């Protein structure tokens, strides 16, 4: 292993932005690793993720989906006009910004899929980014994702370019998607999609690069190479990571780049993929891998096992197998059983950090 990524970063701990995000992704490409992007929905899932990255001595991406951001605000808040998703996203960002330095690792603060119908959510967060930028010289979020993969390619590229123009003065990263990722994710259902549209064409990657590069270097592309969101059995999905290799070679040749990997790729719909598929995709320039479904299951499993094991101590506030007057507070205190979910989720994040070669990269 070469020089650790901390040597490259101006901010060593906490939420990183701008050139530091670029340096992190460049370091990832050069050293054949990717950073897992964990969807967080609560303070509890945030700390489970931060703890795993700290213990594995590596960076992490924490991301909020539109639904996850609304959940952060509370299910009792109306989401008319995306107000809960905007308020929850901002609250989560401030929470992560204030807490992340305590874990001593660099963190990329990101928002996940934003389809066309959810653009008012992204607009509201960008308003807040610009306000924060005026005060602090950096945006609130390190990066955002715009997902117009269901729209015509020209509209996708033009609209993404317009958003990158808005983000560029803040040196804010923008992730975009081209080609469809199958399955179901917040607000986007592509379960019945024709298989061929799961594979992005190299001409599209080049068109994106040509449109976005003159605006800003701070962008990445989630390309379809057979990926599917959600839960599926290994072998049911035909992934073709080698397409990413072809895309890189095509773009390199067409733009005359001296880099073998001129494009920063993102791997979506990764739950259930094999370690070999991850490693192959990473070798072709994938710098970020979205992981959500597996983490949700891991979080639940710790709480499930605790509840099943402690069932006789959770039926009443007082009274258990040790005596009808024995209190159960130590068993039903949320800090006890929620922590069980954090522990199992944290363990699962650690597995991802190993699988993607992220562990030890500081």
UniProtKB/Swiss-Prot annotation:
The active site is at residue 112. D-glyceraldehyde 3-phosphate binds at residue 65. It holds the Pfam family F_bP_aldolase. Dihydroxyacetone phosphate binds at residues 230, 269-271, 290-293. GO terms for biological process: canonical glycolysis; gluconeogenesis. Keywords: Glycolysis, Lyase, Metal-binding, Zinc. Signal peptide: none annotated. Its EC number is 4.1.2.13. Binds 2 Zn(2+) ions per subunit. One is catalytic and the other provides a structural contribution. Pathway: Carbohydrate degradation; glycolysis; D-glyceraldehyde 3-phosphate and glycerone phosphate from D-glucose: step 4/4. Its cofactor is Zn(2+). Zn(2+) 1 binds at residues 113, 229, 268. Zn(2+) 2 binds at residues 147, 177. GO terms for molecular function: fructose-bisphosphate aldolase activity; melatonin binding; zinc ion binding. PROSITE patterns: ALDOLASE_CLASS_II_1 (PS00602), ALDOLASE_CLASS_II_2 (PS00806). PANTHER family: FRUCTOSE-BISPHOSPHATE ALDOLASE, FRUCTOSE-BISPHOSPHATE ALDOLASE CLASS 2. Catalyzes the aldol condensation of dihydroxyacetone phosphate (DHAP or glycerone-phosphate) with glyceraldehyde 3-phosphate (G3P) to form fructose 1,6-bisphosphate (FBP) in gluconeogenesis and the reverse reaction in glycolysis. Belongs to the class II fructose-bisphosphate aldolase family. NCBIfam families: cbbA, FruBisAldo_II_A, PRK09197.1. This is Fructose-bisphosphate aldolase. It comes from Aspergillus oryzae (strain ATCC 42149 / RIB 40) (Yellow koji mold). The gene is fbaA.
